[in-house]
Design a protein with these regions (language model features):
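The feature marks proteins involved in alpha-glucan
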Residues: 1-30, 61-142, 167-249, 254-263, ...
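Beta-sheet entry/capping signal
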Residues: 33, 135-137, 147, 285-286, ...
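Glycine-rich, histidine-containing beta strand-loop boundary motifs that form or position
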Residues: 38, 50, 152, 161, ...
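Short proline/glycine-enriched turn/loop motifs at strand-loop junctions of beta-rich domains
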Residues: 39-45, 141-148
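Short beta-strand elements bearing conserved aromatic residues within extracellular beta-rich modules
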Residues: 46-48, 148-150, 186
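Solvent-exposed serine/threonine-rich low-complexity stretches and specific carbohydrate-binding patches
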Residues: 54-63, 160-168
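Substrate-binding/active-site clefts of carbohydrate-active enzymes
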Residues: 209, 229-247, 251-402
Length: 403
C-alpha cells in the first residue's frame, strides 16, 4: 500500500480540494483511461457498480481506507460504490464527488459583494436533484478554514468523510451528498489554521434540534401549502403609515403553559388555537412575537440567536410555525417579529469564531463584544455579513409571510 501524501490529506482530514483526489480522474494509461477513487475507512472492501456492467472489485491503496480502480475507458455513466464493512454488512452509495457543485461564480460574487439579498436560496442545506439523483447540496462561508466537512449520523459524525471543496477566493465551501433528505441531522466540522476542530451549526440552517442538542436539521422550506392569499393580497393595498396598528407583544414560551406544574410549552399549533382568538377579542390588529429564531438559552427570551433561519424547535417544526402565521392571517391578524441583528451569543456551536477567526464579529473586542450582555457584535463592515443579515430579514418575509 502507498503512503502518498496526496492521498493522506484525505485520511488525515487536511484536504481543501477533495475533487482533486476523489471521484473520476485521468490516468497514466492515456486519454482512454480513467481512475476512480473513494475513501471508505469503515469498509474492508469496495465494489464499483456501473450501469449495465457487473460489479468490479476496487483496490485498497491506503491503509486508512482509500480505494481506487483503473478503467480502460472513462466512466460517463452514473456509478455507485458497494461497501462491505468489517462486520460483513453492506451498503451502496453514489459518489458525492461525481456531481457538479451548484454555486456559480455569480452566486459567489454576490455573496462576497454583500448584494445577495436571498443567499438562503444557495447557502446552507438545499434539497435538490442532480442528474436524476436526490440529495442535499451544502454551502458554507468559512474563508480562513483549513478544511471543512459535513458530519452527521450518515457518516458516523466522522469529519474524514465528506470534506467540502473550497471555491477559491469567495471563502465558500460546497458539496452535494446524495440520498440525504429532510429530517437528517448535520453539522459543519471546521479545521482551523491552528489545527483546532470546531463543530458548528449551519448559519443558514432551516431547522435545528431541540436544545441542549445543537445539530442542524435538513428541511424543505417549500412544502407547506399556504391559505392566506386573501390576506397577502389585501396587505398590498394598505398604507400602513396611515392605518391604525395595535400590536400585542408576546413571548410564546411564557404567555401560557401546560402540564401539571406549567412545565411544558404550548406548540405553535396550540398557540394558534388559544392566542389568536384572545388577541382578536381584545381588538388588536397584529401580534408582535418576541424572537422565535433558534436560541440555546430559555432565559434570553430569544434575544441571543444561534439559528437565524430556523424557528425555534421548542414549540414545534418550521411548518408548525407557518401554520401559526397562516392562521393569524386567516383571522385578519398581522404578524410582526422582533429581529435580532445587533448581537449573537458566544456558544461554541454558533457564529462566534466560526472558522477559528473573528468572521461574523469584529476582531477588536472593543467593537466586537457587547459587555452588558456578554455577546458578540456583528461586523457590519463585512459584505458577507451584510448579505447574511439582509437575506435573513427577507427570508422571514418571503418564506414565512411575516408582515
Amino acid at each position: 500500500m502507498t503512503h502518498n501524501p496526496y492521498l493522506e490529506s484525505i485520511s488525515n482530514g487536511t484536504c481543501a480540494v477533495p475533487y482533486d483526489v476523489l471521484g473520476v480522474h485521468g490516468n497514466d494509461g492515456g486519454a482512454e483511461s480513467s481512475l476512480i477513487r473513494s475513501f471508505q475507512p469503515y469498509a474492508k472492501s469496495v465494489e464499483l457498480i456501473c450501469e449495465g456492467a457487473a460489479p468490479v472489485q476496487m483496490t485498497k491503496v491506503h491503509a486508512n481506507g482509500m480505494f481506487e480502480i483503473a478503467l480502460k475507458t472513462p466512466s460517463e455513466n452514473q456509478y455507485q460504490f458497494k461497501m462491505t464493512g468489517f462486520d460483513d454488512a453492506s451498503w451502496t452509495l453514489h459518489d458525492p464527488y461525481s456531481f457538479p457543485l451548484q454555486l456559480s461564480e455569480l452566486d459567489q460574487h454576490l455573496v462576497a459583494e454583500g448584494t445577495n439579498c436571498r443567499a438562503f436560496n444557495k447557502m446552507g442545506a438545499q434539497l435538490m436533484e442532480i442528474n436524476g439523483v436526490h440529495g442535499v447540496h451544502f454551502a458554507v462561508w468559512a474563508p480562513n478554514a483549513q478544511r471543512v466537512s459535513i458530519i452527521g449520523e450518515f457518516n458516523r459524525w466522522d469529519g474524514r468523510h465528506h470534506p467540502m471543496q473550497t471555491l477559491g477566493g469567495s471563502g465558500i465551501w460546497a458539496l452535494f451528498i446524495p440520498a440525504l433528505t429532510s429530517g437528517d441531522l448535520y453539522k459543519f466540522e471546521i479545521l482551523d489554521r491552528a489545527g483546532e476542530l470546531h463543530e458548528k451549526t449551519d448559519p443558514y440552517g432551516f431547522a435545528s434540534e431541540l436544545r441542549p442538542r445543537t445539530a442542524s436539521v435538513v428541511h424543505d422550506v417549500g412544502t407547506y401549502e399556504w391559505n392566506d392569499a386573501e390576506w397577502i393580497k389585501k396587505r398590498e393595498t394598505i398604507n400602513w403609515y396611515e392605518e391604525p396598528i395595535a400590536a400585542y407583544e408576546v413571548h410564546l414560551g411564557s404567555w401560557k403553559r401546560k402540564g401539571d406544574a406549567g412545565e411544558q410549552f404550548l406548540t405553535y399549533r396550540e398557540l394558534a388555537a388559544d392566542l389568536i382568538p384572545y388577541v382578536k377579542d381584545l381588538g388588536y390588529t397584529h401580534i408582535e412575537l418576541m424572537p422565535i429564531t433558534e436560541h440555546p438559552l430559555d432565559a434570553s427570551w430569544g434575544y441571543q440567536v444561534v439559528g437565524y433561519f430556523a424557528p425555534t424547535s421548542r414549540f414545534g417544526t418550521p411548518d408548525d410555525f407557518k401554520y401559526f402565521v397562516d392562521q393569524c392571517h386567516q383571522a385578519g391578524i398581522g404578524v410582526i417579529l422582533d429581529w435580532v441583528p445587533a448581537h449573537f451569543p458566544k456558544d461554541s456551536h454558533g457564529l462566534g469564531h466560526f472558522d477559528g477567526t473573528a468572521l461574523y464579529e469584529h476582531e477588536d473586542p472593543r467593537m466586537g463584544e457587547h459587555k452588558d450582555w456578554g455577546t458578540k457584535i456583528f461586523n457590519y463592515g463585512r459584505n458577507e455579513v451584510r448579505s447574511f443579515l439582509i437575506s435573513n430579514a427577507v427570508f422571514w418575509c418571503d418564506l414565512y409571510h411575516i408582515d
